[in-house]
């Protein structure tokens, strides 16, 4: 099973396919975990319309080709074909894909860290779709597509919201009737958590401070922007709220 395979692979040099699935796109990187190197990366765009695959092996120029990809399942197949290509690929067979990591935007209150994906996790991600209707359904499409093609490969969900679940109640509760939280889980969740986690740990390392003793303000600046406050290695506040748009 996937769980047993994860246990067997611990301590092994793992090759991991990382997937960030949107409604009509699929970004990916293929990573050697021991060397901390990106072996290949790319993006499938316009899935379901006029699909294209952009692919680049590390150290080589990227190439974009038109591909017929009615669904994300075909997109994943093209990605795997590119990774196994005799001239541009980086692996010889699917057996070299040790795990798949999926970016999932909203994990609600339940997930405080990355988790191995099983049916219960998938069901809860679906439950959280009302909180992230543009993101979670697309993330689930990517998970289902990978499960269909690689049913025995362990898959992990990495949540944007997980890092911020250490916030105290005074930081995540709104000044609204409590029943809105009790019934609809309306509260501050925070996003860009994977970025905030990495940057805060890297900053502590660079200034020579133990992460558990760090006090930091972390900024994520990209397609979106957010700020978080870190105290003793734990997020205590963040600028984004119920949704990434707040």
Tell me what each language-model feature is.
Residues 13-17:
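Extreme N-terminal starter segment of soluble prokaryotic enzymes
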Residues 25-69:
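Short glycine-rich, Thr/Ser-proximal phosphate-binding strand/loop in the N-terminal lobe
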Residues 50-98, 128, 142:
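Conserved active-site "lid/cap" helical segment
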Residues 70-74, 78, 116, 120, ...:
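Conserved active-site and cofactor/substrate-binding residues in soluble primary-metabolism enzymes
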Residues 125-136, 153, 182-193:
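Flexible, glycine/proline-enriched loop segments at strand-loop-helix junctions
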Residues 163-246:
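Glycine-rich phosphate-binding loop of actin/hexokinase-like ATP-binding domains
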């Amino acid at each position: 099973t996937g769980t047993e395979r994860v246990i067997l692979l611990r301590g092994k040099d793992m090759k991991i396919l990382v997937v960030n699935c949107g409604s009509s796109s699929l970004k990916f990187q293929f990573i050697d975990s021991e060397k901390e190197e990106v072996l290949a990366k790319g993006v499938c765009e316009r899935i379901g319309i006029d699909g294209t695959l952009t692919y680049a092996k590390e150290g080589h120029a990227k190439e974009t080709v038109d591909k017929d990809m009615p669904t994300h399942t075909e997109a994943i197949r093209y990605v795997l074909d590119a990774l196994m290509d005799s001239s541009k690929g980086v692996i010889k067979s699917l057996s070299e894909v040790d795990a798949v990591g999926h970016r999932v935007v909203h994990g609600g209150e339940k997930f405080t860290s990355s988790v191995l994906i099983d049916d219960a996790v998938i069901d809860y991600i679906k439950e959280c779709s009302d909180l992230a209707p543009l993101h979670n359904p697309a993330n689930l499409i990517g998970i289902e597509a990978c499960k269909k093609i690689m049913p025995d490969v362990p898959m992990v969900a990495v949540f944007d919201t997980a890092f911020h679940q250490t916030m105290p109640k005074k930081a995540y509760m709104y000044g609204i009737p409590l029943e809105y939280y009790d019934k609809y889980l309306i509260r501050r969740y925070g996003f860009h958590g994977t970025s905030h986690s990495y940057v805060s740990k890297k900053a502590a390392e660079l200034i020579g401070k133990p992460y558990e003793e760090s006090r930091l303000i972390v900024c994520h600046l990209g397609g979106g922007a957010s700020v978080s406050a870190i105290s003793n290695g734990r997020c205590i506040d963040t600028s984004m709220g119920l949704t990434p748009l707040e």
